[in-house]
Amino acid sequence: MDFESKYCTSQVNGTITITTRKVLDENLKSLLDEGKGELFLSCIPRNHSCSPRWIVEVASELGEVYIMRYKIDFSGNSRGYAYLQYINVDLKESAMQYLPMRFRQLCMCLRVEPSTNNRELVLKNVESSLRPWQVYQEMLKIHPFTIVRVYEYQLDQFFYIFEYRNNDSAASAHQRVRNSIRKFGEHAHISWLTAENILSRASGSFCFQREVSQNRTRRVPPRQKGCFKF
């Protein structure tokens, strides 16, 4: 395979990215960029015996890879995991069977699982003097997001759930917000949204949805109460 003609390799901070050079239909590209068909590869050796290029070359035996994001530490060694997507999202199930077997044949015991594609962050303990609209604007300056839900769990006490386009975007936002967390108060904290449902704290609150593009606000149906939604 002529690797260089098919794939482009780049690095930003702790992520080595290998992306197809193929021009894709915009609708398909949008789905892929939102994490459709994403796989999570783990148990990658932390030395250089299992390079990002090698993984893509093996994965390409099944079909053309759209992107692989390979995580490294400050020394350039693998952090033990990576994310992989095929252009053909229907290959996801086949890949979970084929790739572990193929890696074992090549003496590499990598695990291949569906990616959770976690793309939501929770901002808590924000200074009470900051109103939701101010937090919205400050967060938008740090890193673009697709939507934010704002829950009032006590009078004038809010927590914020930010949704990003995909896991990679959320990870970048997480790091940038941590670096700027003092903007939101001495005790402010940003973390990943987990299965331990934080929304239970919001029962009995109220909810509005702001349509930012039209600069107007409308009340959300009762079943969605408990939040502001920008």
Curated annotation (Swiss-Prot):
GO terms for cellular component: cytoplasm; nucleus; ribonucleoprotein complex. One of its GO terms (biological process) is male germline stem cell symmetric division. SUPFAM superfamilies: RNA-binding domain, RBD. One of its GO terms (molecular function) is RNA binding. Signal peptide: none annotated. Disruption phenotype: Viable but males are sterile. Male germline cells are arrested at the transit amplifying stage and over-proliferate. Males display reduced copulation behavior. It is found in: Cytoplasm. Part of a complex composed of at least tut, bam and bgcn; complex formation does not require RNA. Interacts with bam (via N-terminus); the interaction is direct. Interacts with bgcn; the interaction is indirect and is mediated by bam. As part of the bam-bgcn-tut complex associates with twin; may recruit the CCR4-NOT1 deadenylation complex to mRNA 3'UTRs to mediate post-transcriptional regulation of expression. RNA binding protein that forms a complex with bam and bgcn, involved in 3'UTR-dependent regulation of a subset of mRNAs. Preferentially binds a long isoform of mei-P26 transcripts. Involved in 3'UTR-dependent post-transcriptional repression of several 3'-RNA processing factors. Involved in promoting germline stem cell lineage differentiation and mitosis-to-meiosis transition. Required for proper transit amplification of spermatogonia. The RRM domain is required for binding mei-P26 mRNA 3'UTR. This is Protein tumorous testis.
